[in-house]
Amino acid sequence: MANLDLSKYGIVDVKEIVHNPSYDVLFAEETKPSLEGFEKGQVTELGAVNVMTGIYTGRSPKDKFFVKNEASEDSVWWTSDEYKNDNKPCSEAAWADLKAKAVKELSGKRLFVVDTFCGANEATRLKVRFIMEVAWQAHFVTNMFIRPTAEELANYGEPDFVSFNAAKAKVDNYKELGLNSETATVFNLKTKEQVILNTWYGGEMKKGIFSIMNYLNPLRGIASMHCSANTDKEGKSSAIFFGLSGTGKTTLSTDPKRLLIGDDEHGWDNEGVFNYEGGCYAKVINLDKESEPDIYNAIKRDALLENVTVAADGKIDFADKSVTENTRVSYPIYHIENIVKPVSKGPHAKQVIFLSADAFGVLPPVSILTPEQTQYYFLSGFTAKLAGTERGITEPTPTFSACFGAAFLSLHPTKYGEELVKKMEMTGAKAYLVNTGWNGSGKRISIKDTRGIIDAILDGSINEAPTKKIPYFDFEVPTALPGVDPKILDPRDTYADPAQWDEKAKDLAARFQKNFAKFTGNEAGKALVAAGPQL
């Protein structure tokens, strides 16, 4: 297996190639006593290995670039003064320099090469090859991507996309290359390659390939989504949960009554909903065995913890956020008991759930959306950004992230909206906006109440519930749901003085309006303004 020729990538004098290592090999490699610094993994009391990623404990969006060439120029959603995003242009000359730095770093070394699939649908899956010098990074992609069988590996052939992880190399001349810092994550759609320099954070590999799937799939009529998904045990219908980091995608889709398709990245084609990944990447800050048993129990041998505080004897402190609030674990999806087998895909979705963690305490715990509101709130992608998933953010601040994943969109947001709406119209799916954040009590809505709301959406009882309209937003909200505290369903009731809600609601409504202005450059966008908040 290890007779791979890496010289075609410019990587020379390779000492040894460890090709698609087993979990036992990875464990031995990442815990070698001779390892130092961020390469060294620590075995914890739960059997999982913990690693530290240095100053980058989250993605570094300011350091993300696409090479501007004939493959990308007219199709990528480039950042602009009117609408800033993370897709910054990089020159061919800068790319050549960065690629040279990466292959130089990887040359003359003992390397890990992990050949994976991205996408559970064989017809449209991407063959992705990862090349790195650090064992735990090989472990990370082995967890997160779809692991080929021995037969699939034997017939793998050439990859569709190659990611070079040179975390140890720095971009000293970044200013002359037109970059942001000594760190870079750069994509070349022409050569179908990704280069990672000077960041150890595992999520750059995962989300990097997600950006590529988000480029390819909508162009071939497949909805590409930053969401989790599950299905009923009979496999009759799926539900998808959109939401930014920390809004509850992983927690709420991991449901003992249902089968998990996946927790973060999916496609929806004419056959149904399918996972892009072969693993889960869950936040573990304040992880509690009682409230999230599935995730807790997934943390065992072969799982990989990131930036968690672990004592010398292996004892884990999940409450300690001194390194970062964005502590994580990656594990192969089969560490969760209730999953769709053998392939992570399900039927068409009947329920589409938008999760927002509203720090303002304005949004109802659940709203039933019209088709027009569905498009408006999908393009708005509102949440309050929760602490620490990106560098430099620690307080809850309002965030509008198109399609609940603007950081990963490689095409214009309206393209993702179009594809989602097409699929929803085809299957008659309904959308719901669920607030997993705060209300007038100053406390976060309990996970018990949120789970009750999700149950009512999934079993259809929400569609039978009595409802009323909420002002400014014109949301239709149920006034009673089984197993949910009725006093929270109208957010005004959670305030000592409803005038307080009124004031905050007007403020938030104005923020929605201001944000949506950037979508009104065409007729379709203009037509949706009426579905948004009105003052």
Swiss-Prot record:
InterPro entries, per the entry: PEP_carboxykinase_ATP, PEP_carboxykinase_C, PEP_carboxykinase_N, PEPCK_ATP_CS
One MF term in the entry's GO annotations: ATP binding
Highest taxon listed in the record's lineage: Bacteria
Binding, substrate: 59, 201, 207, 328
Recorded catalytic activity of this chain's protein: oxaloacetate + ATP = phosphoenolpyruvate + ADP + CO2
GO biological process, one term: gluconeogenesis
Function: Involved in the gluconeogenesis. Catalyzes the conversion of oxaloacetate (OAA) to phosphoenolpyruvate (PEP) through direct phosphoryl transfer between the nucleoside triphosphate and OAA.
Descriptive protein name: Phosphoenolpyruvate carboxykinase (ATP)
Organism: Parabacteroides distasonis (strain ATCC 8503 / DSM 20701 / CIP 104284 / JCM 5825 / NCTC 11152)
Gene: pckA
